[in-house]
Amino acid sequence: TPFPGNAFSFVDVGPLSVTFSGDSAGTLTYSVQGDGTGGNGSTVTKTISRQAFGTLPVCEFTGSDRSFATQNFQDLWWNPTESGWGINFTHQSNTIFATLFTFEPGVGNNNKGLWLTASMTRQSTGVYSGQLVKVTGSAFDAVPFVPLNPAVNATIVGNMRVEFTDGNTGTLTYDVNGQSV
């Protein structure tokens, strides 16, 4: 079933900034205003560092077509005919860590946002696949922030698979609680 591109709305909840202090470190600062979305107007500042789980890619800006790229698929991907969802791929060595942002199943246009993650490994066929996980944790403004405990906060909800045709095109398939997409 195609994703209904008109089934979402945006609410500006506040500013966000990232300041880098080097190639692998920085500071993330954001505020969520008290506008009925759960924010209380507090400002949160977090120290961030690059998450390295393989050989880091060498990235260079190019204005040219990426269709020839077959070695690194790190990017923010979406289907332009299904605006409202997307997937971020962080690609290092033979692993792609994916963060899928979409909406919970339901009827109508008021479904809650849903974030799922997958750590996918490259198979001998060139396909990347792995388990799809839903995590829960501390609120964005929790002080102190309680780190994620995978044994408590992570639930396997399905599987994810991505096969790239080239650097611009791929096919993503996944299932959530038995429902295939």
Model regions: which residues?
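Mature soluble binding/inhibitory domains
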Residues: 1-181
